[in-house]
């Protein structure tokens, strides 16, 4: 690869699309019109593939649920949409990034998912819900506006949720993100990469910003070759993903202590990779 890491196209797809080896082969074969002869999957491979697909299906349900709440629920309009409007986001941008809202009810998503037949186990494994000590299911993102995180191919792999000042009492953590899972490895994902990849190639440059709203604001301003590391120091995996499309990166972090520390971290990672 241009970033200097060894490997082949299959391994690259496996790493950055979070696919198994058979899934990556099928993806590339379909993309380039190559016919492949398939062998019968082992029982273990079938189970693993089925589980990964199930986790993505549950994430798709959650994305649609959060979007529907934002558009049609009274709290979605008065709290969630009001926040996005305060940031100046247009309807087309809200739709493009599939933004949503989760009500302050602690188990509304969980109850709706169970009612529609989604398994409790998958709700927990995706990180959408967690189980309390008394075995009740609770929504991880209650009372927050929702930012879906997409893979390079556009699959919803995780979510970020921001609490709104004054809207949810007693909550001190501003952002909550999906935990690591079978399909989500934070160090290999960049927020906005699915929407930015074509512009990055066209402009031969990637702008790196800190957060979800930074990416969305720049898209709305017509600058689409932008991604975010979503509050973490840039990792080798994220550097490799950017280098897949360009060797030119401009960092637009805040000038505070945290931003300066992150920039120094980028220097170290870039030098070693």
Task: List the model feature ranges, each with a label.
Residues 1-121, 125, 130, 144, ...:
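Non-catalytic accessory segments of DNA primases and related replication-initiation nucleases
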Residues 13, 229-231, 253-255:
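Short beta->alpha connector loops at strand-helix junctions that form conserved
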Residues 43, 98, 232-233, 256:
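Conserved beta-strand edge residues that scaffold enzyme active sites
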Residues 47-57, 61-62, 103-249, 262-263:
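Phosphate-handling DNA/RNA-contact segment within nucleic-acid enzymes
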Residues 68-70, 98, 185, 202-204, ...:
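A generic structural signal for short
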Residues 213, 255-257:
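Active-site-proximal loop/turn and secondary-structure-junction residues that shape catalytic pockets
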Residues 268-269:
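Acidic, proline/serine/threonine- and glycine-rich low-complexity intrinsically disordered segments
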Residues 272-273:
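Conserved small/polar residues in nucleotide/adenosyl-binding loops
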């Amino acid at each position: 690869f241009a970033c200097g890491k060894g490997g082949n196209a299959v391994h690259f797809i496996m790493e950055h699309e979070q696919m198994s080896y058979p899934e990556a082969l099928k993806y590339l074969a379909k993309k380039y019109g190559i016919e492949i002869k398939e062998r019968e999957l082992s029982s273990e491979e079938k189970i693993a593939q089925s589980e990964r697909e199930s986790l993505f299906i549950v994430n798709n349900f959650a994305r649609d649920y959060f979007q529907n709440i934002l558009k049609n629920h009274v709290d979605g309009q008065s709290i969630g949409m009001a926040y996005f409007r305060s940031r100046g986001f247009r309807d087309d941008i809200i739709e493009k990034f599939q933004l949503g809202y989760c009500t302050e009810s602690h188990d509304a998503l969980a109850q709706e998912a169970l009612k529609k037949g989604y398994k409790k186990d998958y709700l927990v494994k995706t990180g959408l819900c967690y189980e309390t000590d008394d075995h009740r299911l609770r929504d991880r993102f209650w009372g927050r506006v929702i930012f879906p995180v997409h893979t390079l191919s556009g699959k919803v792999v995780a979510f970020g949720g921001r609490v709104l000042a004054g809207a949810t009492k007693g909550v001190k953590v501003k952002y909550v993100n999906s935990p690591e899972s079978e399909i989500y490895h934070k160090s290999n994902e960049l927020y906005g990469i699915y929407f930015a990849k074509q512009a990055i190639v066209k402009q031969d440059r990637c702008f790196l910003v800190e957060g979800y709203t930074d990416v969305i604001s720049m898209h709305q301003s017509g600058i689409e070759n932008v991604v975010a590391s979503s509050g973490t120091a840039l990792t080798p995996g994220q550097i490799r993903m950017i280098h897949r499309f360009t060797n030119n990166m401009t960092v637009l972090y805040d000038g505070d202590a945290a931003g300066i520390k992150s920039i120094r971290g980028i220097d170290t990672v870039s030098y070693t990779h």
